[in-house]
C-alpha cells in the first residue's frame, strides 16, 4: 500500500508540483492543501513543500489564488509542520497565514453576521448552487460571474476560517508569539458562535 501510494503521488507530481488530478495543469491552493494533509506531507514532503509555496505570492508573504480557497492553506501548512517538524517552514508559513487572514478580514468579512463571504470549499463551479445564486440566463460556469455568489456565507468555508484561527494560535504558541495567541483564540471562539447562530438549524439539528 505504501509503495502504491508513493508511486501514485510521484506520478501526479513529475515536475515537483502536486496537481489537482492527472489531467490538470498548474497549481490550485485548495487541491494542493487537501492533498498535502491527506498524505503528501508524510509521503513526499519535499514535493509538498514546493507545492505549498507555489501557491503563495509576494515572496511567500501571502497565500494566492481564489480568495475563498486561500485560508485552507493554513491547515495544510500546520499539518506539514506536525508531520515533518520543520520549524523554518513554519516560521514562513506563519507569516503568510497571518498576513492572509488579516487581508481576508478586511476584504471578505461580513461584520453584520460575523462570517466570511465566498463560495463553499468544493463548489468552485456554479453548478453546485441553486437559484437565486445561480442565474439561469447566465451561461458562465465560473461562480463569481454570478453576482449572487459574492455575498453568500457558506458553512464549509466558515468552518475552515474557524480552524485557521485555532491553528494560527497554535503557530503563535510554537513560535513564541505570545501576544497573538489570545487574540486568535478569541477570534476562533467568536467565529464558532456566529457559525452556530446563523448557519445551524436547531429544528433540524444540523
Residue ranges and their predicted role:
Residues 33-57, 127-148, 183, 190:
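Solvent-exposed, charged interface segments at domain starts and junctions
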Residues 62-68, 105-186, 202:
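The feature captures the catalytic groove of carbohydrate-active enzymes
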Residues 1-92, 98:
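Substrate-binding groove/exosite segments of carbohydrate-active enzymes
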Residues 200-206:
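Carbohydrate-active enzyme catalytic cores, enriched for enzymes
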Residues 22, 32, 93, 120, ...:
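Solvent-exposed, flexible loop/coil residues
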Residues 1-5, 44-57, 87-105, 160, ...:
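Extended, well-ordered alpha-helical scaffold segments
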Amino acid at each position: 500500500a505504501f509503495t502504491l501510494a508513493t508511486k501514485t503521488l510521484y506520478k501526479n507530481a513529475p515536475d515537483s508540483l502536486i496537481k489537482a488530478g492527472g489531467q490538470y495543469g498548474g497549481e490550485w491552493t485548495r487541491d494542493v492543501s487537501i492533498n498535502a494533509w491527506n498524505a503528501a506531507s508524510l509521503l513526499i514532503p519535499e514535493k509538498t513543500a514546493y507545492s505549498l509555496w507555489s501557491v503563495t505570492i509576494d515572496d511567500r508573504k501571502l497565500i494566492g489564488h481564489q480568495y475563498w480557497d486561500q485560508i485552507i492553506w493554513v491547515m495544510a501548512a500546520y499539518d506539514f509542520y506536525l508531520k515533518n517538524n520543520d520549524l523554518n517552514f513554519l516560521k514562513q508559513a506563519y507569516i503568510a497565514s497571518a498576513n492572509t487572514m488579516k487581508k481576508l478580514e478586511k476584504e471578505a468579512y461580513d461584520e453584520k453576521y460575523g462570517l466570511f463571504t465566498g463560495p463553499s470549499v468544493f463548489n468552485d463551479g456554479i453548478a453546485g448552487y441553486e437559484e437565486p445564486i445561480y442565474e439561469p440566463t447566465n451561461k458562465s460556469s465560473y461562480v463569481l460571474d454570478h453576482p449572487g455568489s459574492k455575498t453568500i456565507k457558506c458553512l464549509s468555508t466558515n468552518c475552515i476560517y474557524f480552524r485557521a484561527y485555532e491553528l494560527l494560535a497554535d503557530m503563535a504558541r510554537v513560535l513564541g508569539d505570545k501576544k497573538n495567541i489570545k487574540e486568535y483564540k478569541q477570534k476562533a471562539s467568536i467565529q464558532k458562535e456566529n457559525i452556530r447562530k446563523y448557519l445551524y438549524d436547531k429544528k433540524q439539528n444540523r
